[in-house]
């Protein structure tokens, strides 16, 4: 029987819908303390976090992950109960199987086997686990990192167990992520009767040319590591629902996923210049969710690439595509960060599942990476 499978099931059974942990971290602590980890539970507001470390010297390698999962939606739409882990052939069904309780299980088993083989490993080993990744992400990893910085504790290498793989485990490593800058734009007009437009001002009509220009703008051309910056409108709301009323306001929500070619300050400046050019009366509220980051070829990326090749014979792809992750909070401290985890085809979906054999392969990759990075010779 696979320990990784057993551990994944233990975690899935705990219905830790964000920001709840439901005993996952207490169970993880039991496993890590046996291995000699000093475990600290860190509460920020009502969010539980875990920092566990084995050793006092550098370099420090940390596995990072989250015990919280997204809501299930309509449970009657699921093939099996989402919090009753169920095997079907080589597949394991359950909320969090792929994102990311399977990764955490693989991390623990890999660490058990690595420490058994290398009790006097180089440096220090660590885990950074949060229950606030799938939600607002304000009392999780970002606060743990701030806490560590305040006491001059630095992570040199960090592997985030997000489901990075596409078709088979290890085929893609995320060695960076685009930045995310969102905004809520409220354009003001004058409400009135549609039959008397001269007595009103339609904010939807006013903002339409500006939105067209924003959508057509080439913000940058990207670079060798990042695609071009993307601007997307996600919501437009205006009107009372009546057919004969010109609305008084229009609200637009949009988002940039931006490369290292730009800063969030440059994007804000360019957007506001376009809005001003079109003579709009507006309010604009910005939300910066994360800066872009990139971990270039170096000790961690090379160890991950080598481990994947050793275990699977795959030549992995380095990618910065996709959404944000908690890596965005860790990388700015100077930490080398990669994301490596299961395939992501069913994450956040009804009937989320992962391949049992891939979880075992992932465990081997994690263990091999530790050997590359934290042993001599």
UniProtKB/Swiss-Prot annotation:
Keyword Zinc assigned: yes
InterPro entries: ArgE/DapE_CS (IPR001261), Bact_exopeptidase_dim_dom (IPR036264), DapE_proteobac (IPR005941), Peptidase_M20 (IPR002933), Peptidase_M20_dimer (IPR011650), Peptidase_M20A (IPR050072)
Binding site for Zn(2+) 1: 66, 99, 162
Keywords: Amino-acid biosynthesis, Cobalt, Diaminopimelate biosynthesis, Hydrolase, Lysine biosynthesis, Metal-binding, Zinc
Binding site for Zn(2+) 2: 99, 134, 348
Biological processes per GO annotation: diaminopimelate biosynthetic process; L-arginine biosynthetic process; lysine biosynthetic process via diaminopimelate
Record's catalysed reaction(s): N-succinyl-(2S,6S)-2,6-diaminopimelate + H2O = (2S,6S)-2,6-diaminopimelate + succinate
GO molecular function, one term: zinc ion binding
Record's function text: Catalyzes the hydrolysis of N-succinyl-L,L-diaminopimelic acid (SDAP), forming succinate and LL-2,6-diaminopimelate (DAP), an intermediate involved in the bacterial biosynthesis of lysine and meso-diaminopimelic acid, an essential component of bacterial cell walls.
UniProt cross-references to NCBIfam families, sorted A to Z: dapE_proteo, PRK13009.1
Quaternary data: Homodimer.
Protein name: Succinyl-diaminopimelate desuccinylase
Organism: Alcanivorax borkumensis (strain ATCC 700651 / DSM 11573 / NCIMB 13689 / SK2)
Encoding gene (name): dapE
